[in-house]
A protein has these predicted regions:
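N-terminal small/polar loop signature for handling phosphorylated ligands or for N-terminal nucleophile
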Residues: 1-25
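Short, acidic Gly/Pro/Ser/Thr-rich loop/turn segments
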Residues: 92-95, 151-156, 176-179
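Catalytic core of DAGKc-family lipid kinases
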Residues: 17-147
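ATP/nucleoside-binding phosphotransfer catalytic cores, i.e., glycine-rich phosphate-binding loops
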Residues: 133-140, 161-164, 171-201
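Compositionally biased, charge-rich terminal segments
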Residues: 96-103, 167-176
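Phosphate-binding core of ATP-grasp and ATP-grasp-like enzymes
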Residues: 145-154, 160, 190-194
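Small/polar loops that bind or transfer phosphate-bearing groups
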Residues: 4-5, 32, 173
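Short glycine-/acidic-enriched loop or helix-start segments at secondary-structure transitions
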Residues: 11-13, 41-42, 95, 157, ...
């Protein structure tokens, strides 16, 4: 049972996946949203303002098998890995998530917090040299951010479904300033994939 937000869910899923239990497919966990970020819970229609709905899910054993992603990376000292349920970000997206997690209490709304964080980083539009291989397609060059999601996360992979066996990927190239403003607006409307500087996979 997880009572908390996305951070608590992330810690729990990593605890489960790194445990000594051989058959992890039979492990069930319940979520009662009670954190700054409850993005994954909200995908299922659960909200911290209505904890009774989450309790009803658990009592009635409403089960759904979900996808778990794994990210292998080098942390500067050693190669390691982390598991995730929602989304991971590379580049500027990771910085935005870092800031928005700190401002969520002030803004209250996840999309608004994310958008506000983007505004705070308007002039940090740093590009990252990358080599991506997605579905056999090699992408080399400088990009602003990459989002890999099994669910919608902060809205950069809005079409992702956490139980279809697929990961959605959004590659975001560096937009001009006016395009960044329109991108924030499209993010809030759930239409970010229509932005010409975003390439979805």
């Amino acid at each position: 049972m997880i009572v908390g937000g996305d951070g608590a869910i992330n810690d729990a899923i990593n605890g489960i996946m790194t445990s000594m239990v051989e058959d992890k497919t039979n492990i069930a966990f319940g979520i009662i949203p009670n954190g700054i970020g409850n993005d994954f819970a909200k995908y299922w229609g659960l909200d911290e303002d209505n904890y009774k709905a989450a309790v009803d899910w658990i009592i009635n054993r409403r089960l759904r098998k979900i996808d778990v992603g794994r990210c292998n990376y080098f942390d500067g000292e050693k190669h390691t890995s982390r598991y995730f349920l929602n989304a991971i970000y590379i580049g500027l997206g990771a910085r935005i998530v870092q800031i928005s997690d700190g401002t969520r209490r002030f803004w209250g709304i996840r999309e608004l917090s994310f958008a506000a964080s983007m505004f705070l980083l308007l002039f940090e539009r740093k590009l990252y040299r990358t080599h991506l291989c997605i579905n056999g397609e090699h992408i080399r060059g400088r990009i602003m951010t990459v989002c890999v999601g099994s669910a919608r996360g902060y809205g950069l992979t809005p079409s992702a479904v956490p139980y279809n066996g697929w990961l959605d990927v959004s590659v975001i190239y560096r937009p001009e300033l006016i395009q960044l403003f329109s991108g924030v607006w499209m993010l809030l409307q759930g239409r970010i994939l229509n932005h010409k500087m975003v390439k979805p996979y």
